[in-house]
Amino acid sequence: VASEAPPFWWEEPDWRVLALSPLSAIYAAAAGRGMRRAKREKIEAPVLCIGNFTVGGTGKTPVAIALAKQAKRMRLKPGFLSRGHGGSFAEPHVVDIHHDSARHVGDEPLLLAEHAPVAVTPNRAAGARLLLERHGCDFLIMDDGFQSARIHIDYALVVVDARYGIGNGRVIPGGPLRAKIVDQLVFTSGLLKMGEGTAADAVVRQAARAGRPIFEAHIEPSSKAGLAGKRFLAFAGIGHPEKFFDTVREAGGELALTRPFPDHHFYAEDELAELAATAHAEGLVLITTAKDAARLRHGASQDFLDRLEVLEIDTVFELDHVPERIIDETLDAWRQRKLKG
């Protein structure tokens, strides 16, 4: 994941990239071959995949939620497919937000489950059948799995972070790419550039040259009220914590202290005690992300949670019609798939 990834992945290529290039070539060949030859089970419902070209966080979860909301506005019954993070179930498991913890199902599925049923399993096809048969879903949104899922995808929306782009442009282990861009673009239906920055410009141009539509969106706090004028100790265990810190600043909050943690981090009692003590001593308000709050829900004291502010965010598309277009094109592709049998 991004925060555990070597920093050189996000810098100009150097001797380490050169040294790892033979391994990257082997990985790239295997990954490309795997994507081309994968047997993908066809599901009796439209499947929209929210993926990314690289390892790590690009803001897929808020995008998946925004598109689920759009599907509901179009009178569809969406359901989410997720493999979870660290969760392990022999059979597909539908998330129960009242009883499941992030340790069991992952933090992202807990966030998704506030909006639609979520099936957690590495076997996306089995999860899909569960959502269709038992939960009445008629539109499936897959959170990640773009490269690996053994399920037919009707529309693949690939999310690229404008600030980080595709890093040094090399394939694992020399860089963050999960496969060569040319191999991944074959399976890409549309590209979504998230946020401000120029790091993604080259891959956006490459996608545009390949005839893929380019969309743009950004993250906004759900409510900016309450942040202005406050001094915060902000902490986060996500792919790129700096993005969260910037969002707090942009919403008018003053960041006196920041504490980044690894992606999907489970906080120990002494870490939470240190955060609380520092905030108290400095007269600061603790603030974190919705993902971190999902992990803390069953792992922190109620007293800590009561004093914690959580920054809820929304994905805002630069053009209002884009979410409806993506859902429509997913439905169109599914109808074409059914006609072909």
Label each PLM-derived region with a short phrase:
Residues 32-98:
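Walker A (P-loop) phosphate-binding motif
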Residues 2-46:
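A transmembrane-helix-recognition feature enriched in membrane-embedded lipid enzymes
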